[in-house]
Amino acid sequence: MEQIQVELGVRSYPIFIGQNLLENSDYFSSYLQGKKILIVTNDTIAPLYLAKVQALLASYQCADPVILPDGEQYKTLSQMDAIFTSLLAQNMGRDSVLIALGGGVIGDMTGFAAACYQRGVDFIQIPTTLLSQVDSSVGGKTAVNHPMGKNMIGAFYQPKMVAIDTACLHTLPAREFAAGMAEVIKYGIIWDGSFFSWLEQNVAALKSLDEAALTYAIAKCCQIKADVVAQDETEQGVRALLNLGHTFGHAIEAEMGYGVWLHGEAVAAGTVLAAQTASKMGLVDQSIVCRIEAIFEAFDLPTEAPEAMDFEQFIKHMRRDKKVLNGKLRLVLPKAIGQAEVYGEVSESLLQEVISRA
């Protein structure tokens, strides 16, 4: 079992990583004693893990769970209302704990509900997808989508702990696993070139769900994320680097319809577009772009924008990106494998050239 600490002063919290973590209630006891618990999950995860978690927490006060429909298209304010209704109907107060049992959508919605309910109650993340284990469950970003943009309504609100059971990945569909790998690869590109090289050398081990390889990769990603969040919790500086590929990627998700492209698929294509932009600007050699494309392809991820999207469809969403400052687009672009930077002087004509050739 690995343990990583997210250092945020009095709001610091642990990330536990290990196989069959959901068979040991000791990890949870100090966060649940004397609390009333509401588990929030979805209709895909509930048949797989809800009974297991309920059995794990049998000695605590558990309310009736909330089971939401599965999918990015349901990450909305109207669906989040079901969480609030359940909390109120079961007379749950400020001593409540919400448990997010699921992937990134469930984690984001549960965290946002916890931030809002009675002006803030505790919550715990139990991420069940690779993407949520390496990225969205750590760092306190919570949100729902709006038809005009992804994650536009939300808050920074940290969990009390994160419990990552690698055994959950054995029930994850291959497409979802690949989508999670997009975020894993991102860490290598922006932060750690040696980790990127390790990923290139361990494609087969990761795709076969080798336990040692998985644990190493997840722990490496969580440690990088914890270090970045400790430096810049609310994304005023270095944390923006974690958005590599996301400006293009969020545009793909919003334009194609939430859930048509998985988040990780959109990030993969978006990262290649970012790398091609960096190459056009003379920031990286074309050989770097080729390495980035090759590793995404090795994990069965898209490396091109949707044929159905043109420049105007991209740019209308990109102009709403949360990194826009004084009306100017700001893009995270790679400078090398293991290094990235935020650039605020990227011309739309250059972006049009990159997108048109994609």
UniProtKB/Swiss-Prot annotation:
Question: Which SUPFAM superfamilies is this protein grouped with?
Answer: Dehydroquinate synthase-like
Keywords recorded for this protein, A-Z: Amino-acid biosynthesis, Aromatic amino acid biosynthesis, Cobalt, Cytoplasm, Lyase, Metal-binding, NAD, Nucleotide-binding, Zinc
Q: In which pathway does it act?
A: Metabolic intermediate biosynthesis; chorismate biosynthesis; chorismate from D-erythrose 4-phosphate and phosphoenolpyruvate: step 2/7
Q: What class of enzyme is it?
A: lyase
Write down the InterPro entries for this protein, in alphabetical order.
Dehydroquinate_synthase (IPR050071), DHQ_synth_AroB (IPR016037), DHQ_synth_fam (IPR030963), DHQS/DOIS_N (IPR030960), DHQS_C (IPR056179)
Binding-site residues, NAD(+) = 70-75, 104-108, 128-129, 141, 150, 168-171
Chain residues that bind Zn(2+) = 183, 246, 263
GO terms for biological process, alphabetical: amino acid biosynthetic process; aromatic amino acid family biosynthetic process; chorismate biosynthetic process
Question: So what does this thing catalyse?
Answer: 7-phospho-2-dehydro-3-deoxy-D-arabino-heptonate = 3-dehydroquinate + phosphate
Q: Where in the cell is it found?
A: Cytoplasm
Q: Where is the signal peptide?
A: none
What EC numbers are recorded for this enzyme? 4.2.3.4
**Gene3D superfamilies in the cross-refs:** 3.40.50.1970, Dehydroquinate synthase-like - alpha domain
Instruction: State a GO cellular component annotated for this protein.
Output: cytoplasm
| Cofactor descriptive note | Binds 1 divalent metal cation per subunit. Can use either Co(2+) or Zn(2+).
- Which GO molecular function, any one, fits this protein according to its record? 3-dehydroquinate synthase activity
Q: Does the keyword Metal-binding apply?
A: yes
- List the cofactors: Co(2+); Zn(2+); NAD(+)
Q: What does this protein do?
A: Catalyzes the conversion of 3-deoxy-D-arabino-heptulosonate 7-phosphate (DAHP) to dehydroquinate (DHQ).
Instruction: Spell out the family assignment given in the record's similarity comment.
Output: Belongs to the sugar phosphate cyclases superfamily. Dehydroquinate synthase family.
Q: What is this protein called?
A: 3-dehydroquinate synthase
Q: Which organism is it from?
A: Shewanella loihica (strain ATCC BAA-1088 / PV-4)
